[in-house]
Regions:
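Gly/serine-rich nucleotide phosphate-binding loop at the start of the catalytic core
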Residues: 1-74
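Well-ordered beta-strand positions in beta-sheet-rich domains
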Residues: 6-8, 147-148, 164, 195
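Beta-strand secondary-structure signal
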Residues: 8, 78, 127, 176-178, ...
Length: 418
């Protein structure tokens, strides 16, 4: 089982110079190979230059030799994946008039493969190899005599099998890393009839129903607040920055470092919050001995739907796929199974209806926002949705279990990282 961990480390000026040069060389290698793919007919090539051709043809090039061999090959491979994605989109029409991969204007991350990394078990230090041409260039140009790169961080201690290390261009003496490492895959637990169903939404990011005690609770109400705060702040800074450029006669305003920093901060804040909410669910399942989590499958729910520009911005920004990935691997660490269940009519059917289907769907029962009323009884609409998702899964899989509706009226609000 492969896991990734993102962290940042402080580096000395010599290391910053070396890593920065490798990131620069990677961007130049990308551009050379990309130009070759764009203009292979004008260059007189008989066949389209794929990854196998380019990693051999450019082996003696300047920028290729400034990188470790496998790192240079991985750069060519990432470009190859980008072009394959472009052709798939062009063929399937996933995006109208897709653009081919662009040329890189800035430095790009470099990826060290397993052969270029040396790590002793239990050590907090990594040793990275450097290519011969890069070492001689650094020695002649800057007087840097480093033979290897030694990176230290406490997270390396618990990583026995490091597969990849992705290094981002350094900024202000710090460098971001993504470490991909392998662990032994936990054995999946046998089912005990205890389920947790999850309904994804906007205002209530995750509404959960516990089949063991009928408890319902809501997680993730801070998500929209984070999105709203950063959108307003980015819009405020953009309006000031663009107005200043317009006064100077700039026809096409450019972004600023402040705006880019806000985008990064927003991305990190949302990602951190999603990690904390999914971790809370995984720990809850472990403590309550829940061995199966059923989550509503909302993929393609946004397709060909227009709900107004405000709701569209919220709905299309919902990172549901990232939630699925985070939930799946965190639950997998405890041997808990994750199942995605198609959720049509789960929000319209009464929790007391014989089955969840179009026949018993009553959209008019949702009288107010967040309230579902049937036979004079008021339920929380999202709690009804999570309850019906579990009912639908049990019906489809041919399983039977007695479920309680008493907890659907007033779900508990769980505050995570508030």
């Amino acid at each position: 089982m492969l896991l990734s961990h993102k962290t940042s480390i402080k580096i000395c000026p010599e290391y910053s110079n070396i890593i920065g040069h490798m990131c620069y060389a990677a961007s130049k290698l990308w551009n050379v190979c990309n130009y070759e793919r764009h203009h292979y007919k004008e260059l007189g090539l008989e066949k389209y230059p794929d990854w196998y051709y380019q990693k051999k043809a450019h082996k003696g090039d300047l920028w290729y030799r400034q990188l470790p061999s496998q790192t240079a090959q991985e750069t060519c491979k990432q470009l190859d994946k980008a072009w394959k994605s472009f052709y798939v989109l062009k063929k399937t029409g996933g995006i109208k008039e897709p653009n081919p991969p662009r040329f890189k204007q800035d430095n790009i991350p470099v990826t060290y493969m397993q052969m270029g990394i040396r790590h002793e078990k239990g050590s907090d230090q990594l040793r990275l190899s450097l290519p011969k041409d890069l070492k001689s260039y650094m020695e002649e140009t800057y007087g840097i005599h480093e033979k290897f790169l030694y990176l230290e961080n406490k997270i390396f201690r618990n990583m026995d099998h490091i597969k990849q290390l992705r290094i981002y261009p350094p900024e202000n003496g710090t460098c971001e890393l993504i470490v991909i490492y392998e662990i032994e895959e936990p054995e999946q637990l046998s089912q005990n009839g205890h389920y947790l169903s999850v309904d994804l939404g906007l205002h209530n990011l995750m509404t959960c129903y516990d089949s063991g005690n009928g408890r319902t609770f809501i997680l993730g109400r801070k998500y929209l607040s984070l999105e709203r705060y950063f959108h307003k702040e980015i819009a405020r800074v953009q309006s000031v920055w663009y107005a200043q450029q317009s006064e100077r006669g700039i026809k096409y305003p450019k972004s600023s470092k402040h705006i880019q920093r806000l985008y990064r901060k927003k991305q990190n804040a949302v990602k951190d919050y999603l990690h904390k909410t999914t971790r809370w669910i995984a720990e809850y399942c472990r403590k309550e001995d829940i061995r199966c989590v059923v989550v509503g499958d909302i993929r393609n729910i946004r397709k060909e739907k227009d709900m107004g520009h405000k709701t569209n911005q919220k709905f299309h920004g919902l990172p549901y796929n990232r939630l699925y990935i985070m939930l799946e691997y965190k639950l997998k660490l405890y041997g808990i199974q994750l199942i995605k269940q198609e959720e049509s009519y789960t929000s319209q059917c009464s929790p007391l209806s014989p089955e969840v289907s179009n026949r018993y769907a009553e959209a008019s029962n949702r009288k107010e926002r967040g309230i579902y009323i049937t036979d004079g009884v008021r339920y929380n609409a999202d709690a009804v949705g999570s309850f019906n998702i579990l009912r639908k899964y049990l019906s489809v899989s041919g399983k039977q279990k007695e479920l309680y509706v008493t907890g659907l009226k007033t779900p508990e609000i769980i505050k995570v990282a508030a």
